[in-house]
């Protein structure tokens, strides 16, 4: 192991994650001219560790505070540094979205692994108003994006797909692929809506679904992804 002394005591944990002196990071962020103790919980903080080891992680607190650790990845697209920032900072830190990728071929309510979250963790996040891109229900009227499924402007792409939050069974996502799966520059429709809702709330403005649809550009990320892959 290589020990590097750094400003915020950022270190890799045994499980492949990252940790640091969080209070010191928050204190440093308060030095920014627009950041106060009142809006710190609405402020996204990004820490770039002095490492090229792949393994970004975002620490999130119940009040909404978030610190996204985004190493300088040397992996190819879409797991490059941009992808790490899009997934960790944009997706988790600001959007409060849940992971859509799959680690285990198991039902989420029966998996006994100790390496990732399960039903309780997902429900806790839901109680905070997070993870709107995931559901434990597989019924089209029971998911949080049912309004998109039955809207002709989105029904061609939004549906109910099994698999997400690290498990292949018993948890559902809204589209086949998105940034919260493999870091491509595309957030699915419910994720985009959730992000815009948060922007509006932080700005003290009222969210309008029709305004969201009017300004939504769902093909931008898809086109960029296809161009990158070709």
Residue ranges and their predicted role:
Residues 1-104:
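Active-site-proximal segment of zinc-dependent metalloprotease catalytic domains
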